[in-house]
A protein has these predicted regions:
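Intrinsically disordered or highly flexible coil/loop and linker segments, enriched in small
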Residues: 34, 175-182, 334, 452
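Well-ordered beta-sheet/strand-loop patches within structured domains
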Residues: 2, 38-86, 170, 190, ...
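Eukaryote-specific, cytoplasm-facing alpha-helical/coiled-coil scaffolding segments in long proteins
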Residues: 191-203
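Bacterial Sec-dependent N-terminal signal peptides
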Residues: 1-48
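A sensor for short, sequence-defined functional sites
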Residues: 180, 189-190, 205-210, 214
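Cationic-aromatic interfacial patches
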Residues: 39-194
């Protein structure tokens, strides 16, 4: 154990003598601590120095046991449920290594952390979350030997510092690096898919690859805490958000904003913290769909093309995801989802006229053969053994071209047989897929080279009066149609090579091509959900 004499008059020689003794003792003790810091558990961090205990007041003695006891007191008093708090508690409950002490007392790396904590309000986050004032006060007590009794006793101060520095370090670096709100938790528990007395399942609305602080990251963070000041400072710098949009948004926190505008800004800043590992700006060619804007942006180097789109309705929201456009299908057939069969088609079971008028046919999934619509019941239509398909060509709901990309929702971008939707202000009209207003232009964009011959084939395939016959047998009209089609020009599928990255995102505040931030309506209500989870982290008044 080591001793610290109670504070005397500032000019007292006795005080100066005891301060020197304490510093020498603390240097010796913490040198021993530093040598053992490579171990995750230490049984004797502070040496017992009974031979000099007579120079000390009992209330000013600190030992490893009393330090651990003080840390344990902090653990038991901490009821926070965020990830950083639980990681901190787990570390010390398991006897984890002391991280912030050096041969000189408290490491200078604590000052590096405090420097970041003092600036968190500039990025809209509350300093109270990181105990900045308490840490600064305790650092001053340690460096001036201004200890007292009770909560400010030497052991309580050191225990509190150790615990709060660790918790603040984890909370800051994880919050900035990964976001303070987990989007998968808040966005994937909104729309109920199915509910019964046993459990409730939800529709997945957010499927963007998003990193979270896992075991490897936590181990790295604790390793850095036990390292030197330069390593801590570097780790703090590298924890800043990687999304280029983050810095753009943060700059506007000092603008005079209404309460609603400030909340919108803070919510989008939080979105920009989420670490997706990949961003549109990483690519020279990409497609960006920002759902609230109800527009598509296609970028190829310096070339930019925008177009209106239709998105999923409130009941069938377009999911958020990243992928790559890999193929274009011309005059595609539409395999109609069971959800649409249930709501729009099943009550027409048995009506051949209805199926013929919509260019629908029914297929037996087991045999692969078409089935006469007049022989099919509503229950058969809803079973897994039968499917309803719309023939490709003029009048198909998917239009004349579909843009395919891998995802977990069977969604895609496509043309439409109802272009009037693009003149509407509210274009939340689909079952989740994305309708594009200029499908031919988007198809040309997907080409790696502007091949005139290929462009002509695409134009021909998308404009020829292609109407597959829905009647049994071949009448004169269908025969004439077949003869009029130039099969050499008709395209079926065309691979996109190289594949084009596509980002389906959700920002209600996003810069235009001139860098001006443009607000968009919160079409799916995600802002409120995110803000309600975020507001506990925000600086006063925000």
């Amino acid at each position: 154990m080591f001793s610290v004499k109670k504070r005397q008059h500032v000019n007292s020689p006795t005080l100066r003598t005891h301060r020197l003794i304490v510093k020498l003792l603390f240097l010796f003790i913490l040198t021993t601590l530093a040598l053992s810091a490579c171990h995750e558990k230490e049984e004797h961090l502070f040496l017992s120095l009974d031979s000099i205990s007579q120079i000390s007041d009992e209330s000013m003695l600190v030992s490893e046991e009393s330090l651990r006891e003080a840390i344990h007191h902090m653990v038991m008093a901490d009821s926070d449920r965020d990830v950083a708090a639980m990681q901190t508690r787990r570390h010390y409950l398991n006897g984890g290594a002391i991280r912030w002490m050096t041969r000189d007392g408290v490491s200078a790396k604590a000052d590096s952390l405090v420097a970041y904590l003092e600036r968190v309000e500039q990025v809209g986050i509350s300093p109270k979350l990181f105990y900045a004032s308490q840490i600064k006060d305790d650092l001053e007590r340690v460096r001036s030997l201004n200890f007292g009794e009770g909560k400010n006793s030497v052991s309580r101060v050191y225990g509190r510092l150790e615990y709060l520095l660790t918790k603040a370090f984890l909370r800051y670096t994880e919050g900035q690096r990964f976001g303070f709100v987990n989007p998968r938790e808040v966005l994937n528990r909104l729309d109920v898919r199915d509910s019964d007395s046993v459990r409730t399942t939800y529709r997945q609305l957010y499927d963007v690859p998003t990193k979270r602080p896992g075991k490897d990251y936590v181990a790295l963070a604790f390793g850095v805490m036990g390292s030197d000041d330069a390593s801590v400072a570097k780790f703090l710098r590298e924890s800043e958000p990687k999304n280029p949009l983050y810095a753009t948004l943060v700059r506007h926190l000092s603008d005079p904003l209404s309460k609603a505008d400030l909340q919108r800004l803070q919510t989008n800043i939080e979105r920009s913290r989420w670490d997706h590992g990949d961003y549109p700006q990483n690519h020279s060619k990409y497609v960006l769909i920002n759902i609230p804007s109800v527009h598509l942006l296609a970028v190829n180097g310096e070339e930019r093309m925008t177009m209106r789109i239709g998105i999923g309705s409130l009941k069938t929201k377009t999911p958020l995801l990243n992928s790559r456009v890999k193929r274009m299908d011309f005059n595609p057939q539409w395999v109609i989802p069971k959800s649409i069969v249930k709501t729009s088609i099943r009550h027409h079971a048995g009506s051949r006229a209805y199926f013929d008028s919509h260019n629908y046919f029914i297929i037996n999934r087991n045999t692969g053969k078409q089935v006469d619509p007049s022989t099919v019941s509503a229950d058969m239509l809803m079973s897994k053994d039968y499917g309803v398909v719309q023939r490709g060509g003029v009048g198909n709901a998917l239009g004349r071209v579909v843009f395919r990309f891998d995802n977990n929702f069977s969604i895609y971008m496509h043309d439409t047989s109802n272009p009037g939707v693009f003149s509407q202000r509210d274009r939340s009209v689909s079952h989740g897929c994305i309708r594009v207003a200029r499908p031919y232009d988007l198809a040309v964009f997907m080409l790696s080279k502007k091949d005139e011959a290929m462009m002509e084939r695409m134009r021909y395939s998308m404009t020829i009066d292609y109407r597959p016959s829905h009647t049994r047998g071949n009448d004169d009209e269908s025969e004439k149609q077949k003869e009029s089609i130039d099969k050499k020009k008709m395209l079926g599928s065309l691979n996109v090579n190289p594949q084009v990255p596509i980002f389906i995102s959700y920002y209600t505040l996003y810069p235009d091509q001139n860098g001006t931030l443009v607000p968009y309506p919160d079409v799916y209500g995600y802002d409120n959900v995110i803000y309600n989870s975020l507001k506990g982290y925000l600086a006063s008044g925000q």
